[in-house]
Amino acid sequence: MAGVRLVVIYPRPADIDKFERDYIEQHLPMAAQKIPGKTKLVSAKVLGTASGDPAPFHRIAEVYFPSLQALQEAAGTQGAQATIAHAQAISTGGPPIFLVMEEAAPVPL
């Protein structure tokens, strides 16, 4: 199996400034330090939709792992469980969406 990633999609929070502070100052450092076995951590802020409308989501994080087994092992650790609980606590616009994705072959351009 190819590498996998955990994608976390955060709904638009009730208080964007507070969410941003908590996310940048607390959550990202926690994820970087406490989730074992990851190969990369990427965070992006959603600017809007292609039509220019406000997006229903505010942030998307991607945590990369070399295999599904590595992700599953990481998810069972206290550090990952604490990070997941923190993600849920700071997501004031509703619960975050957690997706597991398998990387596919690149598409030639």
Task: Report residues per predicted region.
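Macromolecular interaction modules
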Residues: M1-L109
